[in-house]
Amino acid sequence: MVRLDAGPTLVVHLHGGCAPPPSRVRVGARLDKSGQGVLVAFPIDEVPNMADDRQLREMTCDPKFRKVLVTDGKSEVGQAVVRALINAGAQLVWVGYAEPWKQSSGLAALEALAPVTLVPLDLTDSRSVKQTAAEIGGKVDILINTAEVHRTQGIASRNGVETARLEMDVNYFGLLRLAQEFGPVMRSRGADGQSSATAWVNLLSIYALCNYPAHGTFSASKAAALSLSQCLRAEMRQGGVRVINVFPGPIDDEWNQTLPPPKLSPAQLASALLKALQDGVEDVYPGDVAQEWLARWHDSPKTLERELSI
């Protein structure tokens, strides 16, 4: 138990680095494996390998010593995420790639890194997802879905449904295929101790909260993925696996070149994603635009909808 300076006495989880009583500690909030808020007493000062405490690792999703699947290593974001995971001490990083006939210099550079293993993975192909899940699904501790298709324009500016169908096929149905094949086996391993499956990360968009007409069909596909991810979270929580949704603002990539700053670099997004894993949170909104939109959405969703349509 810990007695706060304000007077009340609390029952808390005690970090292994805390000095014997009587001693001062810092009390912080974390989520346990069921998603419930708990309090943890930490040492006043940082101690070596503080994040390696066994009890704390049960409450967070630190990739250190863990095996991670990144579903798309061809994108700049995917490559930045892979490098961030390696720097954080991931034991093994599987990197998915689709369309092998398309060359990617960034992917070749990743393959040369010691912890990286490339795996063919096409989220539009149920057979590809099923085969990859059969080969490595039982060993994945953290799944990070970075695969997405992003096209600009709304409804009236584009004829046909081909582009919107492709966005939905990757951004929504791709997530569904992953969830159907990887979800059950990861959920069954959520209580395997230090070798347990621990987290599933979805790269969404702040546009999932409120449609941005200039990126209308992309926004719709991310809104669908958000709804599906909430179902996935409910199912994965039963096994103690945390679902983390990342809602970045505009990313500095080829599809946002006409947008003015501020934009989020792939490295900044990867850093925010890594921190979300290490902190064990469920939702994170990286970047100034995402933070501003989130505040406006909380204040008045209807007002935000109207303002974005101007």
Where are these regions (language model features)?
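Residue(s) in the substrate-gating loop at a strand-loop-helix junction
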Residues: 205
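Conserved glycine-rich Rossmann-like NAD(P)H-binding loop of the short-chain dehydrogenase/reductase
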Residues: 90-106
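Active-site loop immediately N-terminal to the catalytic Tyr-X3-Lys motif
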Residues: 210-216
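Conserved glycine-rich cofactor-binding loop
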Residues: 74-75
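Active-site helix of classical SDR
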Residues: 179, 221-222
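Conserved mid-core segment of classical short-chain dehydrogenase/reductases
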Residues: 130, 148-165, 188, 192-194, ...
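C-terminal helical subdomain
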Residues: 245, 253, 257-297
